[in-house]
Amino acid sequence: ANLFTSDQDLYTDSR
């Protein structure tokens, strides 16, 4: 996830 994305995206990108 990018710094501009929401925190929700951080978890989805942690795959």
From Swiss-Prot:
GO terms for molecular function: lactoperoxidase activity; metal ion binding. It is an enzyme of class 1 (oxidoreductase). The keyword Flavoprotein does not apply. It comes from the Eukaryota. Keywords: Calcium, Heme, Hydrogen peroxide, Iron, Metal-binding, Oxidoreductase, Peroxidase. One of its GO terms (biological process) is hydrogen peroxide catabolic process. Its EC number is 1.11.1.7. Binds 2 calcium ions per subunit. Its cofactor is Ca(2+); heme b. It catalyses: 2 a phenolic donor + H2O2 = 2 a phenolic radical donor + 2 H2O. Removal of H(2)O(2), oxidation of toxic reductants, biosynthesis and degradation of lignin, suberization, auxin catabolism, response to environmental stresses such as wounding, pathogen attack and oxidative stress. These functions might be dependent on each isozyme/isoform in each plant tissue. Belongs to the peroxidase family. Classical plant (class III) peroxidase subfamily. This is Peroxidase 4. It comes from Daucus carota. The lineage of its organism: Eukaryota, Viridiplantae, Streptophyta, Embryophyta, Tracheophyta.
